[in-house]
Amino acid sequence: MSTEKFTITEHLVPGSHIREYPGSTVNQQDVLKIHVKNYTPKREGPVPDDAITFIATHGVGLPKELYEPLWDELLDQASGFHIRAIWMADVASMNQSGIHNEDKLSMDCSWMDHARDLLLMINHFRDQMPRPLVGIGHSFGGNIITNLAYLHPRLFTTLLLLDPLIQLSPPSLGFGTDAPSAINYTLWRDDVWPSREEAIRANRAIMQGMDPRCLDRMTKHFFRDLPTPLYPDVEAIKARFGTTADSTTTPVTLTTPKYHELVAQIRQNFNARDPKTGRIEVPRDTHADMDPLVAYIPLYRPEPRSTFRRLETLRPSCLWVIAGATFLNIDEIREGVKICGSGIGGSGGVPDGRVREVVLPGFGHLMPFQEVKTVAGTCVVWLQQEMDRFRQTERQWKEDRDGKSHQAVEENWYKVLKPIPTGRKKRSDKGKL
């Protein structure tokens, strides 16, 4: 249990000012709150100077508490490195953050907002987060943590991307010739049940194969007792299910409302086509990130493609842990691995040993909850290598800086920058008009 291995401290911090999309909040100036958990290992003795601070990001609609068994395994398997703390925040519209913000949230969501929220959180708690920092993200959280690295290239020493949603092609959208997908399921699914027990039974398919530790957290944190703003009338819900009014059984709904999960998965583009002329015109005030070539499609999601296109510039080293049976486009993800960090500003990529891909055959997208030990062990091997490199780099930096002045530039500046001539040539007036 995480409480046996970690001291867990909860925080509520403000989100970043001005959201990416004006429709993310009821009023554009609304201040959102971000619910944060800080997991600090219970240990005897001082914390080593090079102990890692992890910044973690979750998948769409998945409570951050589901990842606690993964933190337990990382701590148990850690060898060649130490853990200072693990920090994880719920996205503003999801889980505990969503509950705190439910009177301010509206029907839009940008993944970029959480990257900015995390940067704000890191600055807020900077005194507790000395280097090295390591980012770890699952699913759309892998995309978000990558964008945080784009925002601040030297922030992270390395990234651990667990089946990240970084690809060029959109998912199946369930219209035209597309088969229904997770997006269709999210919109049309049931989202209220007469009891927690009934909710667990109804959702057993998504819980199938989960580690018992994750399953326990799923039953506690994935559902929420009524009333909620979406379902304020408990008696009406009881009547719908034929439950007596005096019953002590409490109806439940999803902790993250399905509509917030939906708009995080996909974004609407319903107004690009002029109803009078039939012409497609991108409404740039609200949809500037829409590719004009595909603006005829009524749904889109910009971040997977835009993040993929910047992979060459990714500065921190990166481990890609890919689920062999993922529903994502695995071929495109692997193409991303090939170019990751290979361009100007990047880490050097695969050729320099700064990027590695590990495919776990047979594992699905929810592998952090189903194969906890294996996923943790894969990350540990990479962290051992990267921490050895970090220590070597730090030692070399200190040696190179030893004895240097911090008040004046070194002699090489005077060798490279030639002095300005002291004499002035007589000015000619021949060129005057």
UniProtKB/Swiss-Prot annotation:
InterPro entries for the chain: AB_hydrolase_1, AB_hydrolase_fold
Principal EC category: hydrolase
Predominant localisation class: other
UniProt-listed GO biological process terms: mycophenolic acid biosynthetic process; terpenoid biosynthetic process
Subcellular location(s) of the protein: Peroxisome matrix
Any one GO CC term of the record: peroxisomal matrix
Residues binding substrate, per UniProt: 60, 140
Region (Abhydrolase domain): 58-246
EC number from the UniProt entry: 3.1.1.-
Protein's UniProt keywords contain Chloroplast: no
Alphabetical keyword list: Hydrolase, Peroxisome
Catalyzed chemical reaction(s): mycophenolyl-CoA + H2O = mycophenolate + CoA + H(+)
Active site: 139, 163, 365
A Gene Ontology molecular function term of the record: hydrolase activity
Record-linked Pfam families: Abhydrolase_6
Pathway the protein contributes to: Secondary metabolite biosynthesis; terpenoid biosynthesis
Protein family: Belongs to the AB hydrolase superfamily. MpaH hydrolase family.
Functional description taken from the UniProt entry: Type I acyl-CoA thioesterase; part of the gene cluster that mediates the biosynthesis of mycophenolic acid (MPA), the first isolated antibiotic natural product in the world obtained from a culture of Penicillium brevicompactum in 1893. MpaH acts as a peroxisomal acyl-CoA hydrolase that converts MPA-CoA into the final product MPA. The first step of the pathway is the synthesis of 5-methylorsellinic acid (5MOA) by the cytosolic polyketide synthase mpaC.
Record's subunit section: Homodimer.
Name of this protein: Type I acyl-CoA thioesterase mpaH
Lineage of origin: Eukaryota, Fungi, Dikarya, Ascomycota, Pezizomycotina
Encoding gene, per UniProt annotation: mpaH
